Amino acid sequence: MKREHNHRESSAGEGGSSSMTTVIKEEAAGVDELLVVLGYKVRSSDMADVAHKLEQLEMVLGDGISNLSDETVHYNPSDLSGWVESMLSDLDPTRIQEKPDSEYDLRAIPGSAVYPRDEHVTRRSKRTRIESELSSTRSVVVLDSQETGVRLVHALLACAEAVQQNNLKLADALVKHVGLLASSQAGAMRKVATYFAEGLARRIYRIYPRDDVALSSFSDTLQIHFYESCPYLKFAHFTANQAILEVFATAEKVHVIDLGLNHGLQWPALIQALALRPNGPPDFRLTGIGYSLTDIQEVGWKLGQLASTIGVNFEFKSIALNNLSDLKPEMLDIRPGLESVAVNSVFELHRLLAHPGSIDKFLSTIKSIRPDIMTVVEQEANHNGTVFLDRFTESLHYYSSLFDSLEGPPSQDRVMSELFLGRQILNLVACEGEDRVERHETLNQWRNRFGLGGFKPVSIGSNAYKQASMLLALYAGADGYNVEENEGCLLLGWQTRPLIATSAWRINRVE
């Protein structure tokens, strides 16, 4: 702790006289003479208030002073009341100083203890609120992370509501308050709040995040880290592959159309499974769709090397598109009657919802090629409503669960995974119109869309459910994950909240 004392040292010749004069002057001014001798200026009338603040400070420092910043500067400690107040403010960032020019009293944001408390906070929270014997309205020190956490959530929601009402002045004040409250939190809550606060700030100040083709390779790289750090993508690939393998069980030629190839992480496992088929491996054709033709071709070459090594005949076709709605049937080179066709989409279809009519056009294209199965993995969330505050609230709960599931020992994969999810949050909160591409919908909403598009559901099956559950049991932190079967679809969730859903579809031939 750094303290800067603004005392001026008097010369030796006048030191004694000066000290006595000071005591007399201070006593005449009603300042307590005993504290003056110790170098502190405290009026007798302020003694009760100072005693109250000192009691608060003693409580705060009860567990040590390790939480004080090394860069803290306390000015003029001879002003005991002001010095203690500054100490309390530094220790507790939730204490908001009232400014004469401030139009909004942000201290009114409510809160109550609902978040899990750690052992350190439990010890301190017993002495969190101290009531003065002289007044029941004295300020209190709120250091309990539970209380601050609830205040943080209320501040985020209040800011989102101000944005919805286009009250940008209030929103500006609230988003700054959110940053202050978030700084006192730790773990997943702090990270989630920081991303949502940044999204709100970008929306308020109109500094929108980019989501263009130039950044697609970076997003693909982040997705690799997300794949490594948690089971969500592994679950998506495994369950989709199981559904595809059931359809390909006896086919001699098979064709997979991947709507978002990225780094091709899904297909080595499928190629190996086809190689082990009792009746021998089929000829395997893969059509990979993505943004960069060069990147797609490189992934195809690597998969071809793997297939050759394990004895699977492999053919690859690359297609570069900026939007899946631009896909045409003739691009896919379908060979009717000669091959079994599967279409695969992992976290791709929701992006089509940013462009009116695109999803209907796309489903019409897929229907025209008559695949034997279409596997779809999407976020289990409703982030595509018309009311901003509703979307914000739903996404805050959704990503809080996701970030909570990522908590663990620090690693590069975890940090990059958080950035991967953070970019989604920024797009969801800050952007509108065609720029807002993170438009997640629930499984029931996708059921309605596919039903109207001429598709019917295919049950993924209990075998995939059992194997997915076994896969999760081997994963670190598996106790928090759960697999749920819902009308032939499989959902993976954290604690009690479903987070992603895998479904399978085929053409409804009776329409």
UniProtKB/Swiss-Prot annotation:
Residues covered by region (PFYRE): 341-427
Tissue expression notes: Predominantly expressed in germinating seeds and flowers and siliques. Highly expressed in inflorescences and weakly or not expressed in rosette leaves, etiolated seedlings, siliques, mature stems and roots. RGA and GAI transcripts were detected at slightly varying levels in all tissues examined. RGL2 signal was undetected, and RGL3 signal was very weak in all tissues examined (rosette leaves, seedlings, inflorescences, and siliques) except inflorescences. In the flower, it is expressed in developing ovules as well as in developing anthers throughout microspore development.
Pfam families in UniProt: DELLA, GRAS
UniProt short sequence motif VHIID, positions renumbered to this chain: 254-258
Reported modifications of this chain: Phosphorylated. May be ubiquitinated, as suggested by its interaction with GID2. Ubiquitination is however unsure since in contrast to other DELLA proteins, it is not ubiquitinated and degraded upon GA application. Nevertheless, ubiquitination may be triggered by other processes.
Protein localization: Nucleus
Record's compositionally biased regions (Basic and acidic residues): 1-11
Loss of function: phenotype: Rga, gai, rgl1, rgl2 and rgl3 pentuple mutant displays constitutive GA responses even in the absence of GA treatment.
Annotated region described as Leucine repeat II (LRII), given as residue ranges: 298-330
UniProt motif LXXLL motif: location: 349-353
Subunit-level organization: Interacts directly with the GID2/SLY1 component of the SCF(GID2) complex. Interacts (via N-terminus) with GID1A, GID1B and GID1B (via N-terminus). Interacts with the BOI proteins BOI, BRG1, BRG2 and BRG3. Binds to and coactivates GAF1/IDD2 and ENY/IDD1.
Record-given protein name: DELLA protein RGL1
Organism: Arabidopsis thaliana
